[in-house]
């Protein structure tokens, strides 16, 4: 604190001026974020950090900076920001959660798994971390660990939608399609506007060969989230299963326009 006061005297500016400048940058960043002006938000956050590099709130700003950079598609910068924030506050669940989400987005699932596990060392009742770690375990083929995480969620909160969605995903992977469909249906009755539920149930319907029901769920998912590329990929898979190649190709093209990997789309077409 003494060093900080000396710095203020040297530069000849009163504390309130520096503080005001810092919070003005923070407010500007907030306005840019609301307007989805990611470049403006990044610039404002960096300016705030430079204005008061010792401010105790900088860990939170680093988290916000990382998220802004992530939304802008600058994943390397986002990773640096989250990691630098964790150097300031190693036990920040918010930073760990944000970095885990970024790792998942860039397919670094092992590192995402580690961050979610770190969150659970801090708070073993964190439902979000249990849910996402369970999904990653499922993606890795570890159904035992996946089931343990989903069971833990339901033990903590028997009414948890995440716990039930996790179990439905587990049942689907294990080939128990009717059971998975039933669990999805139970959750949909309580959460009728949640797009991911219709996507999950539609996939189970596709695997079960119930294409008409899958189409209905996909239609609802598109109504709820028309910019989600996964929905169009799912619809394309249903069409490919019925040899509707040209229509499926159009859906995959739309998915790529929305951000789906073009090489993966080509691979799906080649497999059929």
Where do the model's predicted regions map?
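Residue-level recognition of tetratricopeptide repeat
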Residues: 21, 55-58, 92, 126, ...
């Amino acid at each position: 604190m003494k060093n900080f006061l000396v710095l203020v005297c040297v530069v000849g500016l009163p504390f309130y001026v520096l503080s005001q400048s810092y919070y003005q940058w923070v407010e500007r960043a907030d306005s840019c974020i609301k307007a989805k002006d990611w470049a403006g938000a990044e610039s404002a956050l960096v300016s705030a950090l430079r204005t008061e590099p010792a401010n105790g709130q900088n860990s939170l700003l680093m988290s916000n900076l990382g998220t802004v950079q992530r939304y802008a598609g600058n994943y390397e910068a986002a990773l640096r920001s989250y990691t630098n924030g964790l150097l300031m506050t190693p036990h920040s669940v918010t930073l760990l959660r944000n970095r885990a989400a970024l790792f998942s987005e860039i397919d670094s699932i092992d590192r995402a798994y580690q961050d979610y596990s770190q969150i659970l060392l801090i708070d073993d009742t964190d439902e979000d971390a249990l849910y996402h770690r369970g999904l990653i375990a499922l993606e890795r083929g570890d159904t035992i660990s996946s089931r343990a995480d989903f069971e833990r969620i339901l033990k903590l909160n028997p009414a948890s939608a995440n716990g039930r969605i996790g179990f439905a995903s587990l049942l689907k992977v294990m080939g128990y399609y009717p059971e998975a469909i039933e669990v999805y249906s139970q959750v949909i009755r309580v959460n009728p506007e949640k797009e991911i539920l219709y996507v999950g149930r539609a996939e189970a319907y596709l695997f079960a060969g119930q294409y008409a029901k899958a189409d209905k769920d996909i239609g609802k998912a598109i109504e709820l989230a028309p910019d989600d590329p996964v929905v169009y990929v799912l619809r394309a898979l249903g069409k490919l299963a019925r040899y509707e190649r040209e229509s499926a190709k159009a859906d995959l093209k739309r998915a790529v326009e929305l951000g789906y990997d073009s090489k993966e789309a080509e691979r799906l077409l080649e497999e059929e």
